[in-house]
Design a protein with these regions (language model features):
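Bacterial Sec-dependent N-terminal signal peptides
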Residues: 1-24
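Extracellular and organelle-lumenal recognition/adhesion modules and their flexible linkers in secreted
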Residues: 22-220
Length: 220
């Protein structure tokens, strides 16, 4: 027992002395090492807080392929004026291609006087810049009859920064639709809206909105 106590005391004393030991560092400023280029910068990068998607990658639509959750559609929401209805459902059959795991089906009952919208908030907002033109594209199929508009609005949806009517006739086969939106105001917290004024079903996938990209490279 005495030997055990002596060992524990010795260990504690050694730990205390090590923790309080003096350390001296000598720096020889007259003998520098390798010269570092003034153009070389270091930065921490990790795909959190939208450093990649919503950061270096220029895509402005968050969860554009509806793959982020098995049951819900994060960053997407719907809105309908009085007298209109819109329902959403994730589906996993009849998809665009083998790479896609899901698509979003919209069931719409609207009219010109009472519209229904699918809204994306982007990555903590979509940065609308006055005079900037954004390229919109998406894939769709279904059995929908009516008009569709694409918009950039403020977060409340009561200010329209850009709007275009889409020349769409949604049919049974997957078709890619494209358009451009040019913002008339600045708002770092804008949102994207797809506005419907007809009836039927639309299946959507790969909804994309890009600002001008480096060397105008398509898809970022």
């Amino acid at each position: 027992m005495n030997k055990k106590r002596q060992f524990l005391l010795s260990a504690a004393l050694a730990t205390f002395m090590a923790a309080n030991a003096q350390v001296t560092i000598h720096v020889d400023a007259s003998n520098p090492g390798v010269k570092v280029s003034p153009n070389l910068y270091g930065i921490f990068f990790e795909d959190i807080n939208h450093a990649a998607d919503g950061g270096l990658y220029a895509e402005l639509i968050s969860n554009r392929s509806f793959e982020d959750d098995d049951k819900n559609i994060p960053t997407w929401k719907t809105s309908a004026q009085e007298g209109a209805k819109i329902q959403t459902q994730l589906i996993n059959k009849g998809l665009l291609n083998k790479a896609q795991g899901k698509a979003l089906q919209l069931t719409i009952a609207a009219k010109p006087a009472a519209t229904a919208s699918l809204i994306n908030e982007g990555f903590w907002g979509i940065n609308a810049v006055q005079g900037r033109t954004y390229k919109l594209s998406f894939w769709a199929k279904g059995s929908y009859k009516g008009g569709l508009k694409a918009r950039l609005t403020n977060a409340k949806g009561d200010k329209v920064y850009a709007e275009t009517s889409l020349n769409t006739k949604v049919g049974k086969k997957w078709t890619k639709y494209t358009a451009e939106l040019t913002a008339n105001a600045n708002d770092a917290k804008a949102q994207f809206e797809l506005v419907a004024n007809g009836k039927g079903t639309i299946v959507l996938d790969v909804v994309s909105l890009f600002p001008p990209t480096f060397k105008n490279r398509e898809n970022g």
